[in-house]
Amino acid sequence: AHGIAIDGRSGVETVLVSSRENTCFKRYSLTGEYLSSIELHGAYVCRPVVHEENIYAGVCWSGKLFRPNSGFVTILDKSDRVVSNPGGSEPFYENGKLKSIRQHGSLFKHCHDVCLDAAGNIYVCQWNAQGAYPIKLERLSES
């Protein structure tokens, strides 16, 4: 595990655990019973961050474990479907299953964690990124 969060978006609290090498989040009851997995093919995810109706996470590696200078941010909706990957490929579902997602461009290096402020801006910290400062992704207004 490389991160954990309590997810109460459904009205019932569960525990979300990042399973980085399995490219997924695993969901457990508060008593430790395994419930399900959220598959994120190609995304070696870090700590899940629950904010309002979404889950946000840094992706430390993309495509292949330990791939140098890769990574992006992934955002899942209230149905646990990937809806956006800043710095990564557009999510595509086929027969209800997420196709592999990967870094697109070279904005990020090993996104290791994210946090959000009250306005919904995302702050991304990077690991092993030659001393790079955190990056702020500003939320655009919905119109």
Predicted regions and their residues:
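Short, solvent-exposed loop/turn segments at conserved positions within beta-propeller repeat blades
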Residues: R20-E21, K64-N69, N128-Q130
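Short loop/turn segments that connect beta-strands within beta-propeller blades
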Residues: S29-E33, D77-S79, E138-S141
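Short, conserved, GDST-rich strand-edge loop motifs in beta-rich repeat architectures
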Residues: G58-V73, P134-I135
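Surface-exposed loop and turn segments in beta-propeller and other repeat-based domains
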Residues: S79-S106
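Short coil/turn segments at the loop-to-beta-strand junctions that recur within blades
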Residues: Y34, L40-V45, S89-Y93
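Beta-rich, blade/repeat-based domains predominating
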Residues: A1-T14, N22, H41-I55, C60-G63, ...
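Blade-level signature of beta-propeller repeat domains, shared across WD40, Kelch, NHL, RCC1
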Residues: L107-S143
